């Protein structure tokens, strides 16, 4: 797996950067990168903000089981990514996903509006990173 990641992650990172630049040239106010290995691959360096959607392990596991995963598959998927503590530490926005989908959607919409407001008012987005500002 490490060999495969060493071969693919740099190329994927270049393609991501090209796509982001293309979107911005076309006038998109922002681009969203949804990649479970973003931190591990170093792609967070091309992001103005890092969002982490968090839920307790029992909730995450239950949702994975409902999608047909086994607990072993769930554990393997989580082990292949950065630790949850590391994701939380690097995040500029943490969204609580322990509740229902409507509550999560409302939180995402609120943070997205705030982010777009920052993008519109500043050519260089600087999102606060302290937990108190999340």
Put a short name on every predicted segment.
Residues 18-30, 44-53, 57-69, 83-134:
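NTP-dependent small-molecule kinase module
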Residues 1-29:
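ATP-dependent small-molecule kinase phosphotransfer cores
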Residues 6-9, 71, 101:
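Flexible, glycine- and charge-enriched loops at secondary-structure boundaries
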Residues 31-40:
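Switch II (G3) loop of P-loop NTPases
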């Amino acid at each position: 797996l490490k060999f495969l990641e060493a071969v693919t992650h740099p190329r994927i990172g270049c393609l991501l950067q090209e796509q982001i630049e293309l979107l911005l040239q076309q006038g998109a106010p922002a681009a969203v990168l949804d990649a479970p290995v973003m931190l591990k691959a170093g792609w967070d360096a091309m992001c103005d903000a890092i969002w982490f959607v968090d839920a307790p392990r029992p909730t995450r596991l239950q949702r994975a089981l409902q999608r047909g995963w086994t607990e072993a598959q769930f554990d393997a998927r989580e082990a292949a990514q950065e630790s949850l503590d590391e994701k939380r530490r690097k995040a500029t926005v943490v969204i609580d996903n322990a509740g229902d989908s409507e509550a999560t959607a409302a939180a995402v919409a609120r943070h997205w509006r705030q982010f777009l407001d920052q993008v519109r008012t500043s050519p260089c987005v600087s999102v606060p990173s302290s937990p108190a500002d999340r």
